[in-house]
C-alpha cells in the first residue's frame, strides 16, 4: 500500500480562507505552491509566508489558462496537484436575473474548472500520477431560492468531477470533489459566540483535502461532504 507523493501544487481561484489554508498546509509538507487569481495583489502576504508564486489568470479564458500552466511548469515544475477553488454568484429573483451575469457565474464556477482540469490532466496522464480537486458547495447538490446561477455552476462542476473521476482514475489520476456544506469562517466572517464550531474552519477543510490526497489508490474517494456538526442536511 503506497501513499502518493506530490511535489508541485497549483491552486486556482486563490485568496484568503480555504486557498490560504491549503497553501500553508502544502508548504509545510514540502510541496512547492503556485497561486492563481484574477488579481494577485491580494496574495502578497500569503506568498511571503508560504514562498508561493502568484500568477494572474482569468480561468474562463482558454489561452490564459494554457499560458498559466506553461509558466508554472517552467518556473516551479509540472503541477501534480491542481485545486480549483474559483466560483461566482449572481443572486436575485429568477425573473430578474441578467443573462450576462448568469453566463459569467456559470463560466467561472464550471467552464473554468473544465479548462484548468484539462490542462492539468494533459500533463498528469503521461506520468500516470496526479490529483485534481474541485471545491463544491451546498449548491452542488441543492438548489436554493434566488441562487439559480450558483447552483447551475456548481451542479455542472460536480458533473465534471464525476465524469473525470470515472475516466481518469483508471489512468492513475485521483479526481475528487468536495461538497462544502456550510459557511466557512474567516477574518471578516466570524461564527456566533454562543455557537462554537458552527462554521467550517478552513484549516480543518484543508486537512480533509490533504487526507484525500494521501489515500492509497486501492481506496480512493471521488467525493467528500464536509459540514459543521450543527448543520442540518
Report the location of each language-model feature.
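Catalytic loop of short-chain dehydrogenase/reductase
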Residues: 131-156, 161-162, 166-169, 184
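C-terminal helical subdomain
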Residues: 170-185, 191-233
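A short, exposed helix-loop element centered on a Lys and neighboring polar residues
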Residues: 117-118, 162
Amino acid at each position: 500500500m503506497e501513499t502518493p507523493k506530490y511535489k508541485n501544487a497549483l491552486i486556482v481561484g486563490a485568496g484568503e480562507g480555504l486557498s490560504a489554508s491549503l497553501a500553508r498546509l502544502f508548504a509545510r509538507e514540502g510541496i512547492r505552491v503556485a497561486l492563481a487569481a484574477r488579481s494577485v495583489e491580494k496574495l502578497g502576504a500569503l506568498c511571503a509566508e508560504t514562498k508561493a508564486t502568484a500568477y494572474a489568470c482569468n480561468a474562463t479564458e482558454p489561452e490564459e489558462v494554457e499560458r498559466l500552466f506553461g509558466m508554472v511548469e517552467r518556473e516551479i515544475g509540472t503541477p501534480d496537484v491542481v485545486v480549483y477553488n474559483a466560483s461566482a454568484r449572481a443572486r436575485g429573483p429568477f425573473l430578474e436575473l441578467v443573462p450576462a451575469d448568469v453566463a459569467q457565474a456559470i463560466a467561472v464556477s464550471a467552464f473554468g474548472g473544465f479548462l484548468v482540469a484539462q490542462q492539468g490532466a494533459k500533463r498528469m496522464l503521461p506520468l500516470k500520477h496526479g490529483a485534481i480537486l474541485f471545491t463544491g458547495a451546498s449548491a452542488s447538490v441543492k438548489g436554493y431560492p434566488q441562487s439559480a446561477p450558483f447552483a447551475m455552476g456548481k451542479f455542472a462542476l460536480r458533473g465534471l468531477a464525476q465524469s473525470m473521476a470515472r475516466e481518469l482514475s483508471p489512468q492513475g489520476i485521483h479526481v475528487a470533489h468536495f461538497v462544502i456544506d456550510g459557511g466557512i469562517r474567516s477574518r471578516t466572517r466570524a461564527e456566533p459566540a454562543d455557537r462554537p464550531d458552527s462554521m467550517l474552519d478552513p484549516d480543518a477543510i484543508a486537512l480533509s483535502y490533504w487526507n484525500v490526497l494521501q489515500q492509497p489508490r486501492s481506496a480512493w474517494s471521488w467525493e467528500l461532504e464536509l459540514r459543521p456538526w450543527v448543520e442540518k442536511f
